[in-house]
Curated annotation (Swiss-Prot):
InterPro entries: ORF8_bat_SARS-CoV_HKU3-1-like, ORF8_betacoronavirus, SARS_ORF8_IG
Organism domain of life: Viruses
Organism: Bat coronavirus HKU3
Segment forming the signal sequence: 1-15
Intrachain disulfide bonds: C25-C90, C37-C102, C61-C83
Protein name: Non-structural protein 8
Alphabetically ordered keywords of this record: Disulfide bond, Signal
Domain SARS ORF8 Ig-like: 19-121
Leftover remarks: This protein corresponds nearly to the fused 8a and 8b proteins of SARS-CoV.
CDD domains for this protein: ORF8-Ig_bat_SARS-CoV_HKU3-1_type-III-like
Amino acid sequence: MKLLIVFGLLASVYCFHRECSIQECCENQPYQIEDPCPIHYYSDWFIKIGSRKSARLVQLCEGDYGRRIPIHYEMFGNYTISCEPLEINCQAPPVGSLIVRCSYDYDFVEHHDVRVVLDFI
């Protein structure tokens, strides 16, 4: 029984580590986010609205890689400054959470999502 509990805790820590990135930034200052995707992977940034796995994802950048530009939404204000690399105003997302989608393929057919949590200093 104890072994099962220990295994469950280890699995939880491992899963949390792989699906979440915690980064520190100065509040209301421009901040270049460290991309948690592995090297040679494509990354696409979103705001996830809602807590469910099937929650709506709102894309932060558009265009082809090498020429991506921010999409400005009225509800987010000027949250996104630039896209390559992603630079934001260091603040909690106005709604939802910040998500990066990582994929080895350009078309993102197979991907995994990583939640980025900002710790304000």
